[in-house]
């Protein structure tokens, strides 16, 4: 299927590895030129070279802290008029909220709620004027099923704030073929998953290998998701075929979410 994205431009945050990298690669395979961002310059440059080598598209790596105004301006200067924005950021570390300081909460809100909102604010009006835009916020399936991740209360809390904001804005720009959706990953085979498994294993008093077995057993698909699967779905959500889908929070978790809605 031709996704109708060839020649378009995208900003992809936290794209040096994991789900962000998978989304960037999937978009590049559809002919999308990229500006990718992460903090680590070496890893980001390596990813840019790999994606460009595989797909032939233009990939500009901008190593910067996207949670700062300077970092956001650097990314936007490299791609001032994106057709696609992929908001993505690593969540705060797992833990008991009783041990979390006020500054920890502020950092989490800045990274996982305010930064995506500021990036959306910077690009959405241009998308409206051009009559095409796709914005995806990569959050967590915990937004819909918080009880599954008791150690991620901070992450779920601030990402839920972003989700509420998008629920309002997405309806305001839909008439101009600008969609804003949340992709809510469950357990995908990434570094972040492995960190969470180690934390959960320590809390439960068993090995991370045993924790991984238990985690897979809670997924009807019987396995962890692969980043490539996530990237392919995100690319479709950015496509010209997905213009009637907006304001939604779509869970990709192998069937683990127990609800109907």
Model-derived segments and their meaning:
Residues 3, 18, 235, 246-261:
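Short C-terminal tail/terminal secondary-structure segment
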Residues 3-33:
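Canonical Rossmann dinucleotide-binding motif of NAD(H)/NADP(H)-dependent dehydrogenases/reductases
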Residues 88-94, 255:
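Conserved NAD(P)H cofactor-binding loop of Rossmann-fold oxidoreductase domains
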Residues 96-97, 104-109, 215-216:
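Substrate-binding pocket helix/loop in short-chain dehydrogenase/reductase
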Residues 120-121, 167:
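A short, exposed helix-loop element centered on a Lys and neighboring polar residues
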Residues 136-162, 166-175, 187:
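Catalytic loop of short-chain dehydrogenase/reductase
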Residues 174, 179, 245-247:
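Short, small/polar-rich loop/turn modules that mediate ligand/substrate recognition or access, typified
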């Amino acid at each position: 299927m031709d996704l109708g994205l060839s020649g378009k431009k995208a900003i992809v945050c936290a794209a040096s590895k994991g789900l962000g990298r998978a989304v960037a690669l999937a978009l590049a395979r559809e002919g999308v030129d990229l500006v990718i961002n992460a903090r680590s310059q070496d890893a980001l440059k390596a990813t840019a070279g790999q994606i460009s080598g595989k797909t032939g598209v233009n990939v500009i790596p901008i190593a910067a802290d996207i949670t700062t105004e300077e970092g956001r301006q650097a990314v936007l200067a490299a791609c001032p008029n994106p057709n696609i924005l992929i908001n993505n950021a690593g969540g705060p570390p797992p833990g008991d909220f009783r041990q979390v300081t006020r500054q920890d909460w502020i950092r989490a809100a800045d990274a996982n709620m305010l930064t995506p909102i500021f990036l959306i604010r910077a690009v959405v009006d241009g998308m409206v004027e051009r009559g095409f835009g796709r914005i995806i916020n990569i959050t967590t399936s915990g937004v819909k099923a918080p009880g599954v991740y008791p150690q991620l209360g901070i992450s779920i809390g601030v990402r839920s704030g972003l989700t509420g904001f998008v629920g309002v804005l997405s309806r305001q720009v839909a008439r101009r073929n600008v969609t804003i959706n949340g992709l809510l990953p469950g357990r995908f085979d990434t570094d972040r998953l492995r960190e969470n498994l180690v934390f959960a294993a320590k809390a439960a008093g068993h090995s991370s290998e045993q924790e991984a077995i238990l985690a897979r057993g809670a997924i009807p698909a019987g396995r962890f998701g692969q980043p490539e699967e996530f990237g392919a779905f995100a690319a479709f959500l950015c496509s010209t075929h997905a213009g009637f889908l907006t304001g939604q929070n779509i869970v990709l978790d192998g069937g683990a979410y127990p609800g109907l809605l």
